[in-house]
Amino acid sequence: QSIPYAIRNLERLSIASPLPAELPALTDVVRQLVGSSILRQIGNASLALTVRVLSFSYRDGLPEDDSGHGGGWVFDCRFLPNPGREERFATLTGRDPAVAGYLQSEPAVRVFLDRVKALVDDAVDNYRGRNFTDLSVAFGCTGGRHRSVYCAERLGEHLRGRGVAVELRHREIGSGS
């Protein structure tokens, strides 16, 4: 039962502390172990999928992939209407009801989120069927406080409604759940 957990730990360690280049055979073995879906399924432990949802500002660069496998998406919200340009929303975030109401009333935002949800739902179903444990979805905008936060919150809410474990982080406003 501990093998799947050991594989996840090995995966995280191999990312945090890569093996030296002069050990290519060992690097290949670690890569094969980490990539083995069979080893991840051994034992009675049921491995659950966790979707990591993140909001961020493009000003500070793309977020790091903590899972190490790179599975998921980065969505650019800068094309959506920007509440940050309106004085009344300047000090608020996408978590505040006034900003959420503004963005929810915009057809482009609703269409965008519907499409993102459909895409992520397909991936969640696929990942669950293959016993994958990590999927990342990041939303970026100019300041990382309004549009990206709102979109991350809505996706997290949607996924939790489907019974999916969600880790939600807002890099620029320093909070999440």
Predicted regions and their residues:
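Short beta-strand-centered segment that lines the nucleotide-binding/catalytic pocket of NTP-utilizing
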Residues: 164-175
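Post-Walker A helix-loop "phosphate-sensing" segment adjacent to the P-loop in P-loop NTPases
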Residues: 156-166
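A generic structural signal for well-ordered alpha-helical surface patches
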Residues: 114-121, 149-153, 157
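Catalytic cysteine-centered active loop of the rhodanese-like fold, especially the PTP/DSP P-loop
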Residues: 133-156
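C-terminal accessory "lid"/substrate-recognition subdomains
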Residues: 1-137, 174-177
